[in-house]
Amino acid sequence: MSRPVPNPGILDIAPYTPGKSPVPEAGRKVFKLSANETPFGPSPKAMDAYRNAVAHLQDYPEGTSRVLREAIGRAYGLDPDRIICGAGSDEILNLLAHVYLSHGDEAVSTTHSFLVYPIATTANGAENVVAPEVDYTADVDAILQRVTPKTKMVWLANPNNPTGTYLPFDEIKRLHGGLPPHVLLVLDAAYSDYVSRNDYELGIELAATTGNTVLTHTFSKIHGLAALRIGWMFGPAHVVDAVNRIRGPFNVSTPAMLAAAAAIGDTAHVQMSKVHTEKWRNWLTDEVTKLGLKVTPSVTNFILIHFPTTKGKTASEADAFLTKRGLVLRALDNYGLPNALRMTIGTEEANRLVADGLRDFMAQK
């Protein structure tokens, strides 16, 4: 039977699988620690802005997200005209791929990088080239070795999801310096707000001064606006112009726009979340390590826990054990990490329950 046929490569893409969203059961408290969501929710100022926007739902949004672009510009010292807002940074990543990748092109990502990168690459007919990592960390030399005349883009999450590792800014500059000027370097800084390292920078300097670097960011993580789907990009004027030509005219809703503008101004809320995350990330790393499990050093709001392959001690068995206790972590088979679980840093209660649960799991005979 004849029917419409998708473009080549589309059906080869494995659909993105989000973290589990469990249905609470009567009499049992459930902690979702699978999607790197903040346990504190959004800023009260963001919620007030969202509520106030409800009275104007009959009106189309302002098509360029001007209010939000200006708020981002003030927060980071950026030119608002070089900022684009999108329905999550995912939309912007896909728009970049649509603008710059086509059949016969290549884009480089690393072994355990965000799955949207290979999806966006393949969906636009290009080939995803994988550069191996070292200790679950992007390797600049490996990336540069895989750049060919066909390469049009390099994707780099810094810090990386799902490993929680990062590259110092000197390494980012070295990576950029080794790329031909026609290769676009995409720096995804979704988790940057959690980083407290002196050698880390978002990459604003490169995005501001070079013609082939963009920085993307999101309001889904530390700002707690994941449900509103809001992200942004800063980059060269010519990249912004190209992306704006295919961006939907009303791609960011008014409630999302105003909530995000309020959220970015509430620095006290952000700092509170950052301090909590760092404290409990360190605590969890220590507690889990005491159990004989390896934890990849993280600078984000999650940790990557590695399990043995011994029957009775595997990641999948630990996942099932914790789920029965209402503790939902993220299995990572689709990231090529079948022996690991990713855990979002949650409330104190959730963190202690996971530590206790893993202790009981590892003590089983």
Swiss-Prot record:
Domain of life per record: Bacteria
Pathway linked to the protein: Amino-acid biosynthesis; L-histidine biosynthesis; L-histidine from 5-phospho-alpha-D-ribose 1-diphosphate: step 7/9
Any single biological process term in GO: L-histidine biosynthetic process
Keywords: Amino-acid biosynthesis, Aminotransferase, Histidine biosynthesis, Pyridoxal phosphate, Transferase
Gene3D superfamilies: Aspartate Aminotransferase, domain 1, Type I PLP-dependent aspartate aminotransferase-like (Major domain)
Subunit comment: Homodimer.
Family: Belongs to the class-II pyridoxal-phosphate-dependent aminotransferase family. Histidinol-phosphate aminotransferase subfamily.
UniProt protein name: Histidinol-phosphate aminotransferase
Natural source organism: Nitrobacter hamburgensis (strain DSM 10229 / NCIMB 13809 / X14)
Gene: hisC
